[in-house]
Amino acid sequence: MGDIIKIKENREFQRIYRKGRYAVSRALAMYMLPNYSQVNRIGITASKKYGKSVKRNRIKRLIKENYRAIQDNLKIGYDFVIVARKTDGSVEPDFNTIHKELNYLAKKLNILVR
């Protein structure tokens, strides 16, 4: 279990959005694109539509921790962008909900090893 390598540049996000595959769940969207290296990289976003900065940063922290928990079960050599989606209810997704949705998206994109 290594460190998380982040995607930081806007052009890399745009390349993954344009050329990558994606899957959507209720609270998250995951985009993926092969990077042909021996590591996975991740970018996490939450638009201003999601809420104020406190709310956006909290959901990004939850996504990051859940990704850290499942990263050993993912195939190697991909760039991922995970987008927090605004839910229709007033209830914010909790740790377990995000964990279930990340696993669902990984299965849908066929990137789970186990």
Name these PLM-found stretches.
Residues M1-R114:
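Positively charged, solvent-exposed patches that mediate nucleic-acid binding
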